[in-house]
């Protein structure tokens, strides 16, 4: 364990005082060059030197702290995460105004030190400027060509479902952790779109990539990495950062090897996936004399890494929340399975069935809303000086009738039909809206309905529904706390 991580885990008063003094020296050393911004800034709690407002923050549920502060300061206010000043937008209407109505102003990504270490300004998720615009445009066009969110995606998901069901069946109704099997199933969908083929769950290259991506997301949310984001000069003393950098190096090596194999068998007239399309575009530009385009190896490797990580953790985590919530609330599971049995019977569910399964669709949307796996999203930064709404705006009234419970009726009308809600922003909005939204919606619907069609989910022996803990695990995304479920065959 490193010095910094050891300090973070101790409760000794002497050590804590020593830590504060140690960090204060570093703060004084680094803060001399800071300058005040021009004009009146949004209100907020007064920050302490070095620590900012961190003593007011619930580290397990920081979004709860920020929501409470919005009641006092309004829907736009300032909060200091250590020495870093952040403007917080609270409430659906305010967020929509910024990300949609003023998309150009709020469309850049705030790239923290750890994410710069990950991507070096390349790829799709953690980049800005012309390179990001070109990579996102290329990704949107080509991922659609390979069926993301369309019939091609549906075929890939339907191909994967039997493999996941087989893994669940092997447990023969005994309690097990769904994390790994769900991770591999979802990872295979993006693998098929990016590389052109799926992997076996026993393939060490594939399992290594998937497990490493999951671990990296977990490490990114650790206290020591958040400390590094605030004080980058602490990097040499943070073990988690060393592990993350090794994971990124391994990812680059593995993606490079996979790309090399695809390059050797590349047919420009028959692209198998995203990588093939990128290689063809790169080759075409180079042959025409454009040697300094954005289509270079780093953008390819990091774009693939971004797609793989973003396309697996969020969807897989949401699906696991769905299974846990069905176990926690068996009466809702009953209604979902009754609807599936009445409409689908024993045949395979298809995307076109969604319109005839309004209750199931509502439960999936409500799972996304309640699980709220990225409650603070990924930080944005303004692309220029912005005047926004003025300050001390009255906080939005709650957009949800029962915000803290699983309530499918949030997405149902009085006749039981599915209804969209404007405040549902599970995929963000504006220029940075999730480019895989169509695919993720399709995966959640097909995987969820297929699993509920085949299995009855219940707590392990000796555990009641009330014992199941819905407190999320504190990571970069909100994962369910460690748990096991029983999947008993209904067929």
UniProtKB/Swiss-Prot annotation:
<dbReference type="Pfam" id="PF00067">
    <property type="entry name" value="p450"/>
</dbReference>
<dbReference type="InterPro" id="IPR001128">
    <property type="entry name" value="Cyt_P450"/>
</dbReference>
<dbReference type="InterPro" id="IPR050182">
    <property type="entry name" value="Cytochrome_P450_fam2"/>
</dbReference>
<feature type="binding site" description="axial binding residue">
    <location>
        <position position="434"/>
    </location>
    <ligand>
        <name>heme</name>
    </ligand>
</feature>
<keyword id="KW-0479">Metal-binding</keyword>
<keyword id="KW-0492">Microsome</keyword>
<keyword id="KW-0256">Endoplasmic reticulum</keyword>
<keyword id="KW-0560">Oxidoreductase</keyword>
<comment type="similarity">
    <text>Belongs to the cytochrome P450 family.</text>
</comment>
<dbReference type="InterPro" id="IPR002401">
    <property type="entry name" value="Cyt_P450_E_grp-I"/>
</dbReference>
<dbReference type="InterPro" id="IPR036396">
    <property type="entry name" value="Cyt_P450_sf"/>
</dbReference>
<dbReference type="GO" id="GO:0016712">
    <property type="term" value="F:oxidoreductase activity, acting on paired donors, with incorporation or reduction of molecular oxygen, reduced flavin or flavoprotein as one donor, and incorporation of one atom of oxygen"/>
</dbReference>
<protein>
    <recommendedName>
        <fullName>Cytochrome P450 2K3</fullName>
        <ecNumber>1.14.14.1</ecNumber>
    </recommendedName>
</protein>
<keyword id="KW-0472">Membrane</keyword>
<dbReference type="GO" id="GO:0005506">
    <property type="term" value="F:iron ion binding"/>
</dbReference>
<dbReference type="GO" id="GO:0006805">
    <property type="term" value="P:xenobiotic metabolic process"/>
</dbReference>
<dbReference type="InterPro" id="IPR017972">
    <property type="entry name" value="Cyt_P450_CS"/>
</dbReference>
<keyword id="KW-0349">Heme</keyword>
<dbReference type="GO" id="GO:0005789">
    <property type="term" value="C:endoplasmic reticulum membrane"/>
</dbReference>
<keyword id="KW-0503">Monooxygenase</keyword>
<dbReference type="GO" id="GO:0020037">
    <property type="term" value="F:heme binding"/>
</dbReference>
<keyword id="KW-0408">Iron</keyword>
<dbReference type="GO" id="GO:0006082">
    <property type="term" value="P:organic acid metabolic process"/>
</dbReference>
